[in-house]
Amino acid sequence: MTTNRIPVAADHGFAPRRVALTIGALAGAVLIAYANTWSVPFLFDDIVTIVDNPTIRSARPWSSVLSPAAHTGVGGRPIAHLSLVCNYAIGGEAVAGYHGVNLALHLLSGLALFGLVRRTLLRPALAPGLGSHAGAIATAVAALWLLHPVQTQSVTYLSQRTEILMALFYLCTLYCFARGAEPPGRPGWLAASVLSCFAGMASKEVMVTAPVMVLLYDWVFVAGSVRSAWQARWRYYPIARS
């Protein structure tokens, strides 16, 4: 399978300005869809994870931030715990601040999905049939992700910060890999993919499946076979899997 990079210009002029307009439209749609959620109170696990959790009230000692206790609801999830520490440092228990961060993370995951879908459709195997519509298709997929009702629990239920962070880092892992796999090879993007994978694993345990998904993506859209994928990026996969 050829791996020549298809230029963004092949996407019927889906230029940076249009990308910026798309991002603005998606952000506006998210804000409208969740406009009535800013005052949703702390519920259920939020009480243990946020309201009654003394470990988010200080960033010291640093070891406690990176190793939250199991009873806090974010045990073994230091990135999620760190985000709550930062939330509390800025706004205390003001619920709107936590909703704002959840919405921002949700939007970022949608944008990562937009970039992943668009670049995938511009790959040589798909570009002849779908490349000219890559931007529009990616926008539709991202909008569906951002606005689908199934997302409301992870966005508005504040202790589900772990889920949102995991989704964001999962998509960033795939997006950065897609960028890194473009010829002539971009090791910086592959390194960013590995870092995103590590961050996701520090947010929620299900992230452990990400390296498998990256290998499947490599097989289907880039290398054409598992053997070719391994031969081309044998240094990458053991690190990502670890």
Place the predicted regions along the sequence by residue:
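Polytopic membrane enzymes that build or remodel cell-surface glycoconjugates and lipids
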Residues: M1-S242
